[in-house]
Amino acid sequence: MSATSRRAVLAPPRTRKGGAQVAPPGPPVTATPRLFLQLVRDRLGLLTSATAAYGDAVRLTIGPKSIYLFNHPDHAKHVLADNSAAYHKGIGLAEAKRVIGDGLLTSEGEVWRAQRRTVQPMFQNKRIAHQDAVIAGEAARLVERLRARVGGPPVDLAGEMTRLALGVLGRTLLGADLDRFHSIGHAFEDMQDQAMFEMVSLSMVPLWLPLPGHLRFRRARRDLYRVADRLVAGHPDGGDDVVTRLLASPAGVDPRPARRRMREDLVTLLLAGHETTASTLSWAFHLLDRHPEVRERLRAEAVEVLGDRPPVYDDLHRLRYTAMVIEEVMRLYPPVWALTRVAQRDDEVGGYHVPAGADVMISPYTLHRHPAYWTDPERFDPERFDPDRAHGRPRYAYIPFGAGPRFCVGNHLGMMEATFVLAMVSRELRLAHVPGRPVVPEAMLSLRVRGGLPMTVHRA
């Protein structure tokens, strides 16, 4: 039986007066135990199977929650952009607030707008263009570390990408060397683990209980707050960086005490500013090893454009194939795999009624695999992003950086960093998987590689 016919048999949508469908189709309430188990063990599998079985609009009832999963470019445009005022941050927000506080990722309304205005100037193209030497320098240090491991035991590439991304973040935005804070990467892993535990347990387990995960979380939060305190305490006056802007910004509509505000805003920036780039680069090197023809073409472009010099900002438009590779990596493994919202008032999406208070989800992971917009969607094919082939594709079929007012503020910086790193590493080195070691995606706050990514280093 086809997915289309299953939709018709299993869950025909109800209609209300006037013909609008009341609720999308979806699994029956009796499927709640199975869905909950999938939510805990295989979140990506849950979303993929739901859209395959029921189509572009699915209602998932999991315990007391009903999640409205929409999987069409028009749906994404409506929820995230055109009618974004009717939707606030959604599923997992309360849990994320308990873990990382009220920073830019979790705030709403006037508080969020004030926070965005504070940091946005740091991400303008003209400022980013002047950071090219800093980013190339961090990439060169990565190449040097990897070069020292040629022919040696495997290196945890995911860990190296985290170290690199934190190094770039520290020098470009914070005016600090974050390499001296060795615990940051592990602390964020513990924070993510706790955030997902909070979400799937519906925050029903008190944080004060001395469970191993709670103890790791409290230690991680303490370590990150210490990092934030040291960044503020050792910060020089008059710098051109985020710390300076945060220190100078008035509290305004933000009700948090000053010290808590600085801590939470810096921890949020540390998390958001490194996690997505580190994840994208990890998946990029994984896919390049699986597709040597792509790796060799990328290397040839790097050699032709750069020779043996470091890249500069003006090279970005010349490293076009490298950018296409990164775009395809983010199609298959979008760093943010789910964008969640809560409807603030009754709405209609794709002909379906969405009641006020409903949990709504747009998943870039499933949207980027929609067969109507992506031929052979599981295949790694950077040529999809050749301008000639991309022409006519709906804009909202591809949203690796989100969409609408909450579009990722650091997208240009992240793309420059990823482009420089792929070009500089691939020009000189080849990274290979450890035989027999599976590479499995893990849907946490970002889409990371479960258990790290051990790879051996070889000369190109």
Predicted regions and their residues:
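Cytochrome P450 heme-thiolate monooxygenase catalytic core
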Residues: S2-P24, H88-A94, S107, V111-R113, ...
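Cytochrome P450 catalytic domain signature, combining two hallmark sequence patches
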Residues: K77-A96, T375
